[in-house]
């Protein structure tokens, strides 16, 4: 069993003002995405300025935050927020959902592309390789917060999370680290290696949807579901799996459609 590093979730406290590591991880994700995007910008569109890129990253970040919050409300705890709608604004208490954030990013990309002469999938193909930076940073934030841990296990790398998070004090899968490794590191490598060569429009977006969906679906088998939801079917199906399955199907379809529309790219990939 590995010891859980006792990291204070509060990175900096100045009087009543507290800056949490989880919030800082959002800044790391946004900053990292901007840096990578700036390196890839000339290949995407040489006419775009760094200012336009900054505008894009800003609106994508807004999509993540607003969509992530509303996604959690709708998918994970709707009854509580219907009973007290003001809870929606208490973001410091947690409650963000990737799938909602993903929808927010898609809406932001569609809106920004429409205003700047880019199709939805042109922008999404550019954005997709940036996303794992934010995903990885977010999972580190979850780990520091000692939240979203996994099921009890006796694997050598199991961890006992702090009593405030897990009163049962059981050795558990560090599922946040699994997600960091898969959604952050592995997905980053897959997408950025794949996007190094010219690909037909929609293909990179399809690869993102496919592999994120697979990775999330798999990790859900060892991650404890949200207490207010539990398992939704057959004693093992979680909300995360239900939301990820359409991503897998959509990803396969987008990849197929991308290469069907561009037979030359399909031959080059063989």
From Swiss-Prot:
Residues where a 1,2-diacyl-sn-glycero-3-phospho-(1'-sn-glycerol) binds: 139
InterPro entries listed in its UniProt record: Lgt
Transmembrane segments: 10-30, 56-76, 92-112, 120-140, 175-195, 202-222, 237-257
Membrane topology category: Multi-pass membrane protein
Pathway: Protein modification; lipoprotein biosynthesis (diacylglyceryl transfer)
Record's GO cellular component terms: plasma membrane
UniProt keyword list: Cell inner membrane, Cell membrane, Membrane, Transferase, Transmembrane, Transmembrane helix
GO molecular function terms noted in the UniProt entry: phosphatidylglycerol-prolipoprotein diacylglyceryl transferase activity
GO biological process terms on file: lipoprotein biosynthetic process
EC number(s) from the headed UniProt entry: 2.5.1.145
Keyword Transferase included in the entry's annotation: yes
Location within or outside the cell: Cell inner membrane
Its biological purpose: Catalyzes the transfer of the diacylglyceryl group from phosphatidylglycerol to the sulfhydryl group of the N-terminal cysteine of a prolipoprotein, the first step in the formation of mature lipoproteins.
PANTHER family referenced in this protein's UniProt entry, alphabetically: PHOSPHATIDYLGLYCEROL--PROLIPOPROTEIN DIACYLGLYCERYL TRANSFERASE, PROLIPOPROTEIN DIACYLGLYCERYL TRANSFERASE
HAMAP family attached to this UniProt entry: Lgt
Stated family: Belongs to the Lgt family.
Protein name (Swiss-Prot/TrEMBL): Phosphatidylglycerol--prolipoprotein diacylglyceryl transferase
Organism: Pseudomonas syringae pv. tomato (strain ATCC BAA-871 / DC3000)
